[in-house]
A protein has these predicted regions:
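Ligand-binding pocket scaffold of soluble enzyme catalytic domains
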Residues: 2-10, 17-60, 67, 74-78, ...
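Histidine-acidic metal/acid-base catalytic patches
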Residues: 2-25, 39-43, 93-96, 104-105, ...
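Active-site-proximal loop/turn and secondary-structure-junction residues that shape catalytic pockets
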Residues: 31-35, 56, 88, 126-130, ...
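Residue-level detector of alpha-helix boundaries and kinks
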Residues: 35, 56, 99, 160, ...
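A diffuse structural propensity rather than consistent per-protein peaks
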Residues: 35, 64, 167, 285-287
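Conserved beta-strand positions in the central sheet of alpha/beta enzyme cores
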Residues: 49-51, 84, 123, 194, ...
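Structural motif corresponding to the early beta-alpha repeats
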Residues: 53-176, 187-188, 238, 301
Length: 353
């Protein structure tokens, strides 16, 4: 059997297939490794875009042209594309500590390498601590495990041992300093940066502020250097966790060309920022078809990551360690759902032209 790059057998090309193009989103999964079995499994799901958390050699300080090209070529051997790499700016940048200029130079060097090797997106976080202590697993449909967050579990937690705290104003000063240094380089390199919202979006994380815990913060962040290269990871789940309409917020940032990556998941929010449950992608408060339709309407051309599938028996009984912490069956479900939403949105909008 001979398949083309999109994974479609010659005999069924054109038979009801909506290909991902330069004017449509592309589904992605994060891979823990680039082994043959991992690449094969995501390709079987129709995933074309690959994301990774870092190079197999470590953080940004290990980046060079040869190293990044090796990863890109490895993915290309499977007729897939490496299109996003997560990175950690480092504590000295986030806290504004001595040595941050050296760390900013490390980020700049990595961006320039990414540009030379045609890596289109680099995604990052900017927080002192991710307050995951507020999560617990609660039962969902059929006994599946859902991630539940409540701020009461973490609101009085002290800083971690040996760690300091930082105010919201200080964080804004530090991210401003950072962005003004790196965004001009990203523009020259044609590499878009995507800052992920705080998730969980609690106002305080072990005594420190969180700049990306409100939509107002997202807007402020993108206004520091108004550029498509200074963008966000638009997460429709986090948007709903904050009590906002995901379609409206998607349109706001899309009109400014500052959506550089998308996370696609559903939630049930009881109190914005403070109390919510991540649920199966087909059962929450987010109108997932409306979100996908808005992205398709915008001709958003970058990655969509259908993240955070609930725990399920299949993954518990038959773990697979190549894809985002042993949740292959869960991701098969979320990928299939996201692909169906995208195909439906493309077909619907084509029919109304």
């Amino acid at each position: 059997m001979v398949y083309n790059k999109a994974g479609i057998h010659d005999s069924i090309k054109g038979q009801g297939h909506w290909p991902e193009t330069e004017e449509t989103p592309t589904i992605t999964l994060f891979l823990d490794n680039l082994d043959d079995r991992s690449l094969r499994r995501v390709k079987q799901l129709g995933v074309l875009g690959i994301s990774i958390a870092q190079l197999d050699t470590g953080g940004l300080e290990t980046w060079n042209d040869e190293n990044l090209k090796r990863h890109i070529d490895r993915v290309a051997e499977a007729d897939l594309e490496l299109r996003n790499i997560m990175f950690d700016p480092g504590e000295r940048i986030i806290f504004g500590q001595p040595g941050r200029n050296e760390d900013i130079e490390t980020v700049i060097n990595a961006i320039q390498i990414a540009g030379r090797q045609s890596l289109p997106v680099m995604e990052y976080n900017f927080y002192p601590h991710r307050i995951v202590e507020g999560y617990k697993v609660v039962p969902g449909r059929g006994g599946s495990g859902l991630m539940d967050f409540n701020n009461d579990r973490i609101k009085d937690l002290p800083p971690l041992t040996g760690k300091t705290t930082i105010s919201l104003d200080e964080l804004w000063d530090n991210v401003t300093y950072y962005l003004k240094a790196v965004i001009p380089v990203a523009e020259d390199a044609n590499v878009r940066l995507a800052l992920h919202p705080n998730d969980p979006p609690a106002p305080i994380s072990r005594g420190s502020g969180q700049i990306m815990s409100t939509v107002e913060g997202w807007k402020r962040l993108t206004d520091i250097v108004p550029s498509p290269y200074n963008g966000i990871t638009f997460d429709c789940g986090v948007t709903r966790e904050l009590g906002h309409d995901p379609v409206e917020i998607c349109r706001y940032f899309g009109e400014r060309d500052q959506i550089n990556h998308v996370h696609f998941r559903n939630v049930v929010t009881r109190t914005p920022n403070l109390d919510y449950t991540e649920v199966w992608v087909d059962e929450g408060q987010v109108d997932m078809f409306a979100v996908m339709s808005e992205l398709v309407r915008q001709k958003y051309p970058r990655l969509i990551y259908p993240e955070h599938p609930p725990e399920n028996d299949s993954d518990t009984e038959f773990p697979f360690d190549g894809i985002s912490a042993t949740t292959y069956t869960g991701f098969a479900y979320t990928v299939g759902y996201a692909r169906a939403m995208m195909q439906a949105a493309l077909a619907t909008q084509a029919a109304t032209k």
